Amino acid sequence: MQFFGRLVNTLSSVTNLFSNPFRVKEISVADYTSHERVREEGQLILFQNASNRTWDCILVSPRNPHSGFRLFQLESEADALVNFQQFSSQLPPFYESSVQVLHVEVLQHLSDLIRSHPSWTVTHLAVELGIRECFHHSRIISCANSTENEEGCTPLHLACRKGDSEILVELVQYCHAQMDVTDNKGETAFHYAVQGDNSQVLQLLGKNASAGLNQVNKQGLTPLHLACQMGKQEMVRVLLLCNARCNVMGPSGFPIHTAMKFSQKGCAEMIISMDSSQIHSKDPRYGASPLHWAKNAEMARMLLKRGCDVDSTSAAGNTALHVAVMRNRFDCVMVLLTYGANAGTPGEHGNTPLHLAISKDNMEMIKALIVFGAEVDTPNDFGETPAFMASKISKLITRKALLSLLRTVGADHRFPLIQGVPTDQSSAATPHPIFSLDKTQPPAISLNNLELQDLMPISRARKPAFILSSMRDEKRIHDHLLCLDGGGVKGLVIIQLLIAIEKASGVATKDLFDWVAGTSTGGILALAILHSKSMAYMRGVYFRMKDEVFRGSRPYESGPLEEFLKREFGEHTKMTDVKKPKVMLTGTLSDRQPAELHLFRNYDAPEVIREPRFNQNINLKPPTQPADQLVWRAARSSGAAPTYFRPNGRFLDGGLLANNPTLDAMTEIHEYNQDMIRKGQGNKVKKLSIVVSLGTGRSPQVPVTCVDVFRPSNPWELAKTVFGAKELGKMVVDCCTDPDGRAVDRARAWSEMVGIQYFRLNPQLGSDIMLDEVNDAVLVNALWETEVYIYEHREEFQKLVQMLLSP
């Protein structure tokens, strides 16, 4: 039995030896009385264990000389001596200063630290061990600022990286640790604290003024730069409260630029909230604003909402739009454009964003830039237009696609005649064709068919500029009516058409028309015209608004839409606050059966002498008078599309009864004039001479397979009935809200019968676009199709502009 016992003990010893020779084990000192003492230092003794042929290091407990701990058991005497020397050098300050060290778990941790970090001082080890009493030992205090280790870091660096605020206090208060000492990477304790997770450590460091707060490491980063790079928003806040400087140059500029480069929105917002001037700061290297560094739509939108200059240029002359196009960031491009970025600004070498988009072969981006006003024939410093650059693209398929795209809006890819370009470079060029009535005298400006500048020479020829600028003071002898269809976000099509008319005429829409009628989205635009909001501004507003309003699933929350309307028109603005032009919005009174059409007016409703359709019902409240009607509520009521938004009180969307408000508007004008005559004010009545009706785009006609609804007799017929009911329901809704077809035919016929010039402008769209579409690419494509429509119908636009400008 003794043999087997010794065998088990031997196997156990061997197993422990091979498993972990440095496993700390509590022992009795008496067990080693028969072993030879090889070396002794203080409480540490190295024994030679002859029976096991090992060298054991024993730490005798200072509190009890009969007990101790075996720190290691090694087979090699040389290894044992080396480790004994290291242990005897590092251990004494710990067991001399704290009884907590005299536990197996603590000693094991300390042993592992000593072996893992042989270059560390006792103070470094004390930081990782985390026992506060140890920092009162004189030897640990003496090494508080030591950098003698592989990283060159001080114990304070380690405490900050570890995030141990209690140890940090011990180092600063008792050991007088310096906070501006740098490691091998040039980093101070502040850099280490930023990389940790405990902001309290950073707060403690920041209580005392130190150059380390703004120290730049070898990568050129201050602690604030590093916090922004890592997305540590709370660390950024603490650093700023500790007066960290925001104007220290780093590899990517100032800290705000670093936050933008790494798309750390929270950090950028924190810097701007603490120092609003940082939103306009330009980095010394590139002269770029924070907006130039925006890599996604969210970051760009955040800056622009806080007032960042959208057209700020870098040292090279490029705007943020140039950079976004060069980087193929379509989402950024759309945000910049919708916040008013100039799509035609020349940048480095005179290249506009469109020049750069052509070179990137990005069709969506090209369309977006042209839709937002980029000129296809503006030359750069080398005399190259975007269209000419498209003709030079090496890839045949790409070249053909680009040229085909640009030709649809009248772009000329030939090299233009430009002043300042050498004659040998432009001798083969021919003058660009001008789509105007007088082709013998092309204007001295570059052509932009998309913005209808080909029409501007005509309007200038007919009216000098000083007359155009004073048109609002002229007395027209006839009235002009503008009618705007409903269609949700497709109101962008109306905006694009109005921009074209304004560009061609040189006159704001408000001054071209005496009456404006609108339904739903058309009603919102009618109010925008009334309140002198530019259509370019409204285009951006619509792109921004859709993301705020159309969130989640239908029906959408009404709050965001109402907040948008209040923001744009004012919370307390009344309909009658602005009197010209006269505006009417359609709404549907749904508190009665059958429902009735209601017009929200900025003038008193005309008195109509005719028998009422229904007997008066005392349970039905009369509508609010125009003088008391809030503008935003009128817009909300006109746009309360069923299934998209909840009703606004008793009002539903006006599109249910008048999605194309032309005939209703003409009827209203007739009744208004008749009322004026009855009241003896016939001299104020002016005959309606022009009606302009703008649509939100015609959806393509598609075949319908079945609208049959019947009692099914089998599962197949049930499926057929369900499908038929769905198609029939869609057809009923489309028929009720159809703004084209017979509605247009009736309006045109009535106008012709009474001698009114009628213009219906409504582009054919390539696909059916929903009222709540939020995809930028889809909407840009719809506006592109609108631009193509404008170019193809330029003669009709010419005629319209001529008539609108006539007195």
Curated annotation (Swiss-Prot):
The entry's keywords: ANK repeat, Cell membrane, Cell projection, Cytoplasm, Hydrolase, Lipid metabolism, Membrane, Mitochondrion, Phospholipid metabolism, Repeat, Transmembrane, Transmembrane helix
PROSITE patterns noted in UniProt: ANK_REP_REGION, ANK_REPEAT, PNPLA
Residues the record marks as active site: S520 (nucleophile), D653 (proton acceptor)
Chain positions of motif DGA/G: 653-655
Main localisation: cytoplasm
Catalysed conversion reaction: a 1,2-diacyl-sn-glycero-3-phosphocholine + H2O = a 1-acyl-sn-glycero-3-phosphocholine + a fatty acid + H(+); a 1-O-alkyl-2-acyl-sn-glycero-3-phosphocholine + H2O = a 1-O-alkyl-sn-glycero-3-phosphocholine + a fatty acid + H(+); 1,2-dihexadecanoyl-sn-glycero-3-phosphocholine + H2O = 1-hexadecanoyl-sn-glycero-3-phosphocholine + hexadecanoate + H(+); 1-hexadecanoyl-2-(9Z-octadecenoyl)-sn-glycero-3-phosphocholine + H2O = 1-hexadecanoyl-sn-glycero-3-phosphocholine + (9Z)-octadecenoate + H(+)
GO molecular function per UniProt: 1-alkyl-2-acetylglycerophosphocholine esterase activity; calcium-independent phospholipase A2 activity; identical protein binding; long-chain fatty acyl-CoA hydrolase activity; lysophospholipase activity; serine hydrolase activity
Pfam families in the record: Ank_2, Patatin
Region (Calmodulin-binding (1-9-14 motif)): 678-687
GO BP, sorted A to Z: antibacterial humoral response; cardiolipin acyl-chain remodeling; phosphatidic acid metabolic process; phosphatidylcholine catabolic process; phosphatidylethanolamine catabolic process; platelet activating factor metabolic process; positive regulation of ceramide biosynthetic process; positive regulation of insulin secretion involved in cellular response to glucose stimulus
Top EC category: hydrolase
Protein origin, superkingdom: Eukaryota
Subunit structure: Homodimer formed by catalytic domains tightly interacting through a large hydrophobic interface. The contact area involves 3 alpha helices, several loops and a part of the beta sheet from each monomer. Both active sites of the dimer are in close proximity adopting an open conformation that provide sufficient space for phospholipid access while favoring cooperativity in deacylation-reacylation reactions. Each monomer has 9 ankyrin repeats stacked side-by-side in an elongated structure oriented outwards from the catalytic core.
Annotated protein name in UniProt: 85/88 kDa calcium-independent phospholipase A2
Source organism of this protein record: Cricetulus griseus (Chinese hamster)
Taxonomic path: Eukaryota, Metazoa, Chordata, Craniata, Vertebrata
Gene coding for it: PLA2G6
